[in-house]
Swiss-Prot record:
Residues 29-51 have a biased composition (Low complexity). Disulfide bonds: none annotated. This is Clathrin light chain 1. Keywords: Coated pit, Coiled coil, Cytoplasmic vesicle, Membrane. Residues 200-212, 291-301 have a biased composition (Basic and acidic residues). Residues 111-147 form a coiled coil. Residues 102-164 are annotated as: Involved in binding clathrin heavy chain. It is a peripheral membrane protein. GO terms for molecular function: clathrin heavy chain binding; structural molecule activity. Belongs to the clathrin light chain family. The keyword Heme does not apply.
Length: 301
């Protein structure tokens, strides 16, 4: 069995100097006879039998202790490792060859890889569209800002011109107001009241045709109108029934004429200079004037 697992070139037996089987039969035997028989027979193996096998066994035992696996001895004296022994590892360890499962990623299928590829393409397209839309919005914003500033400058120039014209009209109106205030002060007061009054807008379809009973003007605070109806009511009342200190004094010529007439008739002149008609002292002969008027139609009949 040992020679069966050995290498092909390692099972050659050592050659001896004598060849017993190749001896020439025609050779003449030696005179002594014994010496010739030893040379031509098995005499050449005497040294091998005398202790040669023991030396080989000792060497085999020593090598079997030091070597790994099952050593196989050869007749030639060499040994080869067993074919069933494990192969020595390169790194010198006996751990696992593959990395741990935590470090190994999950194996992705074909559908998952295709989905990831399609998703990456969709995300790139979406990002590109967002960048284009952002650039478009910024461009439109710049154009809007430019147009807004141009329009604002134009409005400012127009407002300046209109304000100058309104200021001229206002100054002329103030001069006219102060010139005519002492002559017709009630008219001047009525002109101070604003005529253009903003109406209250109410929500709802039913309130469109209805108008508020009180018209108000917007006050200094937004959303809180100022009510001027009471002011108008007081001014109208003062116009129709002015107090004594607001009554106009009579002209100087009318006052003098009234004083003279009063002195002649013996009646005092009124304060405002008006002259009352003189009452007739003559009484009708037939009684009261009312009775005379009643009798006149009867006489005509």
């Amino acid at each position: 069995m040992a020679s069966f697992f050995a290498d092909d070139g390692a099972d050659e037996l050592p050659r001896t100097a004598s060849h017993p089987f190749d001896a020439d039969d025609d050779a003449a035997p030696d005179a002594s006879g014994g010496a010739a028989a030893d040379d031509t027979g098995y005499g050449g193996y005497a040294s091998f039998v005398d202790g040669g096998v023991e030396d080989v066994e000792e060497e085999e035992e020593e090598i079997a202790v030091e070597s790994e696996g099952v050593p196989i001895g050869h007749v030639s004296g060499g040994f080869s490792p067993s074919p069933f022994s494990p192969d020595p590892e390169l790194d010198g360890g006996d751990g696992p060859i593959l990395p741990p499962p935590a470090q190994m990623g999950a194996e992705e299928g074909i559908l998952l890889r295709e989905w990831r590829r399609q998703n990456a393409i969709v995300l790139e397209e979406k990002e590109r569209k967002e960048k284009e839309l952002r650039a478009q919005i910024l461009a439109e914003a710049e154009e809007f800002k430019k147009a807004f500033y141009e329009k604002r400058i134009q409005n400012c120039e127009t407002n300046k011109v209109h304000n100058r014209e309104r200021e001229k009209i206002f100054v002329a109106g103030q001069e006219k107001f102060h010139a005519e205030a002492d002559k017709q002060y009630w008219k001047s007061i009525s002109e101070l009241i604003p005529h253009e009054i903003a109406t209250i807008e109410k929500r709802g379809k039913k309130d469109k045709d209805k108008k508020p009973s009180i018209t108000v003007i917007q006050g200094p605070k937004p959303g809180k109108p100022t009510d001027l109806s009471r002011m108008r009511q007081i001014l109208v009342k003062l116009k129709h029934a002015p107090p004594p200190h607001m009554m106009q004094p009579p002209p100087a010529s009318a006052a003098k004429d009234g004083a003279k007439d009063g002195a002649k008739d013996g009646t005092p002149a009124p304060a405002n200079g008006t002259k009352k008609p003189a009452e007739s002292k003559e009484k009708p002969a037939n009684g009261s004037p009312a009775e005379a008027e009643k009798e006149q139609p009867a006489a005509s009949e």
